[in-house]
């Protein structure tokens, strides 16, 4: 029931039910948010104790890279199957068992150090992560407070950076990655059981409405009963409304240079992000010689949290000043940010001083994240209006397949080969890959010139047709 409907309720019985409903939804939201934050903390745990993990599992850098990539494979498979499973099974119990599986993948390290068993559980860790990752925003859209859904959605976006920082800092101070994973598992478990005992109606896709009739003694509307809309009928109506978009497929849009270049540019950006975040703890210890808890925790917190957040805000603000991402100048602005990011990428491997390294890495993430909202906006602007929603899905899928998935492994292969002769080689390659991003954005700027001409011609044709109709 929406907040607007709730405001119409005047009976004491109805108000009591609404208060209970609001508290229940608030508790579920808090539980989901904390769980989502903890689910995003595993990357920080691994990064904080990379040397210990390699020693206990008896693996080299190459295998440690695969150890990171296998989680991304699990997430891809999970993403392809999660919506089917959520529609086939009861959502509350599916989320419950997915979180139990997630906790099991965190605790497996206490029982075995066999690399192949661990890799199987790492795959399941990525697979189980997807269920709350996909369902949480959906739940907010359906059951969130009407006037606060935007704020609630914004909180969801903060879970990933805050979770990563929490996992890194907690594990750094605990001193053992197994304790870091155990902390995540034993915090998720009670929250999982709280969700299990919440009423089913707050997880079901069925939509509830309050039936109101004017029979109160003072003429006001009162709540008498609760009825629910049949789920099958709702699905049929939804299917009737949804029609396939006319025109070319979203996949064919990748053949258009203006769209392909911007998607690949964001993919390159995600590749550098993922490789740096996954291996930064290893770089602290083995290259910079920073084993101090406070130094590592402070640098990771500043770089992973403050840099991306302030960069995204600054990039969006500057883009608005030049007319927004619909203007061709936004590609030129993005190219400028990419060059500044590339300069930082060149300087970082040359630095041995921890303070200078922190500043350079902060600026790298700051300027790189200045591009992120602009790149997403440009990708929307480069496709037909009917394909804008699908464009983000394709964009994200390409970023996962070509960015997040290979990044840890590629870094590991390079580091395993050159760490004895040049321990900075892998980080230098990972960071300076950003120059490919600069080339792609410059090409996008070139191709958008033709796009603007086409749009102008279409607009002139439409205006001419309108004038003819008026006559």
Name what the model sees in each region.
Residues 148-175, 304-312, 396-408:
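Glycine-rich segments within core transmembrane alpha-helices of 12-TM secondary carriers
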Residues 27-61, 276-281:
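Extracytoplasmic
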Residues 179-197, 425-444:
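Symmetry-related core transmembrane helices of the 12-TM Major Facilitator Superfamily/SLC fold
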Residues 156-204:
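Helix-loop-helix hairpin linking two adjacent transmembrane segments in secondary transporters
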Residues 77-115:
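Conserved MFS/SLC helix-loop-helix module at the cytosolic interface between two early adjacent transmembrane helices
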Residues 46-47, 256-313, 369-372, 376, ...:
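Extracytoplasmic gate region of multi-pass secondary transporters
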Residues 121-160:
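Cytoplasmic helix-loop-helix junction between adjacent transmembrane helices
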Residues 93-107, 329-346:
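Structural signature of the two symmetry-related core transmembrane helices
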């Amino acid at each position: 029931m929406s907040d607007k409907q709730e405001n119409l309720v005047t009976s004491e019985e109805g108000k009591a039910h609404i208060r209970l409903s609001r508290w229940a939804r608030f508790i579920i939201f808090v539980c989901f948010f904390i769980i989502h934050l903890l689910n995003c903390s595993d990357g920080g745990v691994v990064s904080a104790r990379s040397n210990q993990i390699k020693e206990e599992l008896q693996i080299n850098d190459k295998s440690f890279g695969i150890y990171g990539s296998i989680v991304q494979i699990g997430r891809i498979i999970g993403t392809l199957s999660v919506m089917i499973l959520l529609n086939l099974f009861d959502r509350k119990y599916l989320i419950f068992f997915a979180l139990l599986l997630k906790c099991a993948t965190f605790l497996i390290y206490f029982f075995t150090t066999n690399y192949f068993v661990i890799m199987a559980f790492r795959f399941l860790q990525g697979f189980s992560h997807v269920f709350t990752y996909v369902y949480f925003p959906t739940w907010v859209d359906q059951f969130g407070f009407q006037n606060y859904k935007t704020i609630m959605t914004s909180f969801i976006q903060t879970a990933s950076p805050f979770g990563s920082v929490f996992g890194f800092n907690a594990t750094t101070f605990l001193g053992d990655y197994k304790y870091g994973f155990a902390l995540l598992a034993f915090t998720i478990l009670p929250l999982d059981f709280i969700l299990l005992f919440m009423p089913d109606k707050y997880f079901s896709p069925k939509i509830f409405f309050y039936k109101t009739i004017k029979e109160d003694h003072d003429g006001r509307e009162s709540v008498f009963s609760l009825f629910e809309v049949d789920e099958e009928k709702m699905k049929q109506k939804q299917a009737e409304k949804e029609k396939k978009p006319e025109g070319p497929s979203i996949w064919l849009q990748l053949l258009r240079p203006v769209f392909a270049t911007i998607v690949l540019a964001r993919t390159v950006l995600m590749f550098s992000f993922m490789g740096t975040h996954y291996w930064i703890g290893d770089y602290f210890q083995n290259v910079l010689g920073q084993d101090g808890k406070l130094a590592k925790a402070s640098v990771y917190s500043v770089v992973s949290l403050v840099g991306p957040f302030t960069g995204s805000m600054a990039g969006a603000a500057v883009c608005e000043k030049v007319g927004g991402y619909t203007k061709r100048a936004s590609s030129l602005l993005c190219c400028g940010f990419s060059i500044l990011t590339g300069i930082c990428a060149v300087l970082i491997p040359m630095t041995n001083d921890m303070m200078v390294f922190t500043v350079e890495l902060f600026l790298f993430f700051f300027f790189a994240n200045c591009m992120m909202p602009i790149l997403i906006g440009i990708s929307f602007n480069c496709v037909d209006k009917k394909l804008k929603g699908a464009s983000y899905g394709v964009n994200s899928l390409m970023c996962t397949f070509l960015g997040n998935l290979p990044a840890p492994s590629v870094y590991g292969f390079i580091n395993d080969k050159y760490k004895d002769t040049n321990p900075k080689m892998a980080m230098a390659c990972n960071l300076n890959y950003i120059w490919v991003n600069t080339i792609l954005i410059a090409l996008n700027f070139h191709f958008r010139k033709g796009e603007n001409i086409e749009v102008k011609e279409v607009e002139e044709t439409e205006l001419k047709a309108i004038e003819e109709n008026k006559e």
